[in-house]
Amino acid sequence: ENSNKNAYVASTQRDLIAGEVSKDLTKRILLPEKITKAHEDGVLHFHDMDYFIQPIFNCCLINIGDMLDNGTVMNGKLIESPKSFQVACTVMTQIISAVASSQYGGQSVDTRHLGKYLRKSADKYRKHYTERYAGKIAPDIIEEFVKERVNDELRSGVQTIQYQINTLMTTNGQSPFVTLFLNLDPKDEYIKENAMIIEEILRQRLEGIKNEKGVYVTPAFPKLIYVLDEHNALKGGEYDYITKLAVRCSAKRMYPDYISAKKMRENYEGNVFSPMGCRSFLVPWKDEN
């Protein structure tokens, strides 16, 4: 069985019972007899019988940028575009949970879509302090206040992501199987903010998360994938310091895994993107033209 599922938990037991019903109906009714026999004889393995009776899919890439920027609807409620980094992190984890409850495989989120919301938080704090202390405090002091508040919100937001993913339960009886794609795109106007976010994600993963006994352990999720490019490949690039942190993190916590942006561009027509959850990559879509 899936080792991510704790069979002592009531919600997981319900999922496992439903899975056995699905397997039975799949073998007896849905599959051709020769496929069922081949599966039983070990000639082949028919995957995911425990979900086959439902019209749901396996893995996906979440279009998190569109859902955050333009808002989305969950449970019949409109979720508007966030006005701060903390709220963006919370909304993102709710989307992850909703997606995990509607499929049975992994999912991936590109964290670079969070950068603009960290800047929104900075702009909000800067406006607040400027209006409150204009002419009373030097601009550089105001910037120190802004930096302190932004760093606090950054830590809290990333902690929200880590705690939510590791504590939320979904309808398939486990925490969301999710990958965070850590990509510093040189063309991204929010690359500075995203560098801060990725660095904080790595720092918190390096620290680990406390178990029920208060001991720091390595969380199973989110899986982390770190993209290596010219500016962070330990060749004197601007973001080499983040890569060095990533290597320390991998040595202690097994993640992140690494992807070469150069090879991705060669193999996928100039595109750099995450696998869906763990290892399956989509191919570039083309129509008949």
Residue ranges and their predicted role:
Residues 1-289:
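Conserved catalytic cores of very large enzyme subunits
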